């Protein structure tokens, strides 16, 4: 199921109707802009709703755990902002972490972040360096395998922080982080007592990514996410809404795909 990570990140940033794995263009609702937008020699197709089927149960939404629907299908990749991502060649590229320099011993990363681009959390609060420091400190405290060797984080100014590591693991950490380690809101989680993974408040799904959670129906086993705007960090969002529906079995899911009930699985 982790293959959806690349599908959803593509959906968030540059998905076209023809480029979606398993999509049935005739079944998709493409009632966004009336005409495709020319981009060089190719045109971008807008999709009003991309319907995704899964067999994973929709059991709440919490960006701090990989055990729920967000973690299992990596919806964190579109609800929150990954620090770094990988391109089609598997090479690490900047995202919310907009650039970095490594020390000679590979024990220090001096990184810049998109905290000056006017991004806000889905509840309207501004994204700041406090969120960056909070997120990395959380990963340190939890001894996250994605950030193995990370021992410290310190803000230098409003857009820059230094990350301290051991054993020259800078390259290893950047590769491990790609697509999976995302920014978390300090103003939400610093107030939560107990295990973050067990928190079920309405703000548990708040992110600053290109899509925000707008509805969860556990009884109907469906979930909807909507684009926050037409563009995100300078890139067009060609899919307006993501609808996720859970099916009881793989056979039922395949039938739904074949009948055009869903566009991807």
Tell what function each PLM region has:
Residues 1-50, 91, 152:
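Short, low-complexity disordered leader/linker segments with a strong preference
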Residues 46, 58-66, 91-93, 171-174, ...:
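Short, solvent-exposed loop/turn elements at domain surfaces
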Residues 46-56, 108-113, 135, 161-163, ...:
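Short, well-ordered beta-strand elements
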Residues 51-104, 206:
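N-terminal lobe/hinge region of extracytoplasmic solute-binding protein
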Residues 88, 179-237:
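Gly/Pro-rich hinge or "lid" segments in bacterial periplasmic/extracellular proteins
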Residues 99-142, 156, 162:
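Aromatic- and charge-enriched surface segment that lines or borders ligand/interaction sites
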Residues 112, 147-190:
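Surface-exposed binding/hinge segments that line
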Residues 230-265:
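Ligand-site clamp/hinge motif
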């Amino acid at each position: 199921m982790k293959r959806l990570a690349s599908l959803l990140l593509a959906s968030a940033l540059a998905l076209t109707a023809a480029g979606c794995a398993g999509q049935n263009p005739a079944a998709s609702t493409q009632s966004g802009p009336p005409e495709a937008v020319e981009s060089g020699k190719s045109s971008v197709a807008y999709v009003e709703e991309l319907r995704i089927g899964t067999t994973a149960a929709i059991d709440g939404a919490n960006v701090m755990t990989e055990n729920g629907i967000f973690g299992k299908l990596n919806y964190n990749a579109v609800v929150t902002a990954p620090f770094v991502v990988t391109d089609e060649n598997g090479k690490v590229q900047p995202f919310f972490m907009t650039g970095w320099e490594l020390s000679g011993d590979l024990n220090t990363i001096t990184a810049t972040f998109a905290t000056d681009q006017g991004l806000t959390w889905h509840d309207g609060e501004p994204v700041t360096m406090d969120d960056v420091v909070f997120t990395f400190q959380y990963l340190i405290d939890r001894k996250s395998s994605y950030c193995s060797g990370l021992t410290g984080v310190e803000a230098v100014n409003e857009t820059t922080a230094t990350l301290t590591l051991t054993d020259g693991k800078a390259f290893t950490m950047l590769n491990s982080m790609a697509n999976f380690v995302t920014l978390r809101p300090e103003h939400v989680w610093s107030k939560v007592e107990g295990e973050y993974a067990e928190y079920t408040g309405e703000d548990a799904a708040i992110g600053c990514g290109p899509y925000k959670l707008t509805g969860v129906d556990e009884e109907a086993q469906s979930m909807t996410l909507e684009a926050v705007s037409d563009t995100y960090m300078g890139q067009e969002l060609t899919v307006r809404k993501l609808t996720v529906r859970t099916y009881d079995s793989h056979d039922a899911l395949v039938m739904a795909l074949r009948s055009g009930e869903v566009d991807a699985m």
